[in-house]
């Protein structure tokens, strides 16, 4: 179906006059549909892990090399890093790795900014002589997680993170905050719903849901009936709800607490296996 045909489905749900070309028609209903088309499209895509709008990406971290950087004693026994235009502020948290000579620098640190070119690793202990050119660092989440990954610019909904084929619950633990993905993994194999704008490839079940959602947003403007918009919203939710019940709609997954070997749960499982 074309964009105009899809928009006309939405207009027909409102018993409104349809458009000849939704991108150029100047009728009030065409202008209303154009205004709401993209917001409704993205909301509908994000409402469910639609197969036609799901793709994969691998997210990796970009580390900053410590080339041309000096590590020394700050005069109080802590490690001071001299790195031109480091860009850090006091209280930020960083990971440092592969440092040779001053191996105590390897780890996770909160930093204190001295000036634009130097910072201290809080509560570190300086020892040794830095081997020039070794080591790298990266900014870490402030607490709770080890790494933060930039999501693809076309991401609308994360489906699976470092998971196995099958149920969404197979995903590794993660959280999404401020458009970044927080994880304890350095590499993320991501499956996500993207901003699919090629209407010719949309599936009919998605088109049906989208038409109802789009109509719900323009109903009050076109029909002057708030109630009609609410009814169409419920119609959209009824189309999507069965899929939602079969899929986890959260934008994160918490860590799983493993039961101890002597827990009642483990004991019950061992008993069941023994008595099989």
Predicted feature locations:
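Small/polar beta-strand repeat architecture
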Residues: 65-142
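Glycine-enriched, solvent-exposed interface loops adjoining structured elements
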Residues: 1-67, 93, 138-276
């Amino acid at each position: 179906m074309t964009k105009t045909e899809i928009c006309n489905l939405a207009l027909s749900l409102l018993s409104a006059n349809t458009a000849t070309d939704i991108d150029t028609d100047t009728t009030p209903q065409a202008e209303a549909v154009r205004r709401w088309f993209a917001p409704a499209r993205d909301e509908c895509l994000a409402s469910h892990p639609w197969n036609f709008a799901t793709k994969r990406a691998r997210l990796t971290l970009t580390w900053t090399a410590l080339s041309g950087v000096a590590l020394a004693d700050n005069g109080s026994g802590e490690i001071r890093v001299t790195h031109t235009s480091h860009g850090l502020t006091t209280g930020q948290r960083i990971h440092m790795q592969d440092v040779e000579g001053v191996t105590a620098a390897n780890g996770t640190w909160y930093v204190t900014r001295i000036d634009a070119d130097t910072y201290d690793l809080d509560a570190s202990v300086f020892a040794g002589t830095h081997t020039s050119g070794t080591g790298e660092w990266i900014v870490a989440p402030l607490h709770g997680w080890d790494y933060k990954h930039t999501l693809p610019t076309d991401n609308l909904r994360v489906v699976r993170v470092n998971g196995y084929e099958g149920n969404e619950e197979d995903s590794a633990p993660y959280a999404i905050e401020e458009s970044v993905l927080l994880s304890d993994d350095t590499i993320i194999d991501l499956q996500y719903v993207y901003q699919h704008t090629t209407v010719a490839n949309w599936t009919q079940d998605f088109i049906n849901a989208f038409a109802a959602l789009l109509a719900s947003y323009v109903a009050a403007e076109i029909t002057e009936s708030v109630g009609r918009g609410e009814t169409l919203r419920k119609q959209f939710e009824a189309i999507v709800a069965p899929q939602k019940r079969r899929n986890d709609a959260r934008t994160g997954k918490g860590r799983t607490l493993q039961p101890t070997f002597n827990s009642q749960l483990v004991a019950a499982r061992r008993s069941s296996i023994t008595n099989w």
